[in-house]
Amino acid sequence: MEVRHNWTVAEVQTLMDKPFMDLIFEAQLVHRKYQQANHVQVSTLLSIKTGACPEDCKYCPQSAHYRTDVDRERLMEVESVLDAAKKAKNSGSTRFCMGAAWKNPKERDMPYLLDMIKGVKEMGLETCMTLGMITADQAGELSEAGLDYYNHNLDTSPEFYGNIITTRTYQDRLDTLSHVRDAGMKICSGGIIGMGESASDRAGLFVELANLPQHPESVPVNMLVKVKGTPLEDAEDVDPFDFIRLIAVARIMMPESAVRLSAGRESMNEQMQALCFMAGANSVFYGCKLLTTPNPDEDTDMQLFKKLGVNSEQVAQKPDQIQEHELLDRVAERVAARPNKDDLFYEASV
């Protein structure tokens, strides 16, 4: 299969409607052709500036437009961010992502952001930031400081977008991605499933991503985390099989990209996550929180990787060079000793 940039919505919908087993099989074949089998890349995400965002994204608990339990916090001190990065590296992450709840970064904040990037890079970690919209000049500054990835999601299809966000346009998002690419950085861009969009909208999101001049190097696929106080707190649950199908579709359409299981993974049981990996997911966020929403902790992830025979880069980069099977056995023993460990997941397949 060739790498394409000319997908149509109708074509993607036909792909989505394939028999489940056929679709997963096709995705796994593509995955093994373009990606390393049985391998998952792990990243850590830190909120470096939380809450009071002026945007009105209906899914987001950090928006100043909604009453949620998220407290407003100033931009973190550089040293505090670097301390968190050290902990992430020691826990096994190979990429450190920093997110700020802004419409766009102010010029007064740029020196601090650049110092964060440089400090994290010195630790040998890949760096990623998500700061909202950025100008071409800001993209150049971030790139010069050593930023590897910039995250800016498209969220949904152009047609459904206005139902979710009104404070920035779809073109604003595409312009930011262009600035990132022109500055020589890698793109991390995906969307959110479960906001009330149609199957056609889901297909449209992936068409937008796959038809970019160059595919995003990383494609996070989020399942909506419903937060009390946001307009989407009562949204319908996403059918697990529909979500797994979308992972497969992303893998087939963007074979060279990393497909990341992102928000919503806390509500997926082990079987659902395993099927997502089979469908082509090969990256996860690692740690107990994604910005302000829950995420499976590191030990739980390592136990699942052991069950599946999945390798993560984090094992090979442990400072003491512990053999992978020894590390996984120790983690599994710790997790097995916990009470009510099965309560970490609800039965998402029902």
UniProtKB/Swiss-Prot annotation:
Cofactor comment: Binds 1 [4Fe-4S] cluster. The cluster is coordinated with 3 cysteines and an exchangeable S-adenosyl-L-methionine. Binds 1 [2Fe-2S] cluster. The cluster is coordinated with 3 cysteines and 1 arginine.
Cofactor: [4Fe-4S] cluster; [2Fe-2S] cluster
Keyword Transferase: yes
InterPro entries assigned to the protein according to its UniProt record, in alphabetical order: Aldolase_TIM (IPR013785), BATS_dom (IPR010722), Biotin_synth/BioAB (IPR002684), Biotin_synthase (IPR024177), Elp3/MiaA/NifB-like_rSAM (IPR006638), rSAM (IPR007197)
UniProt domain Radical SAM core: residue ranges: 38-256
The EC number(s) this enzyme carries: 2.8.1.6
Binding site for [2Fe-2S] cluster: C97, C128, C188, R260
Enzyme class name: transferase
Record's function text: Catalyzes the conversion of dethiobiotin (DTB) to biotin by the insertion of a sulfur atom into dethiobiotin via a radical-based mechanism.
Name of the protein this chain belongs to: Biotin synthase
Taxonomic classification: Bacteria, Pseudomonadati, Pseudomonadota, Gammaproteobacteria, Vibrionales
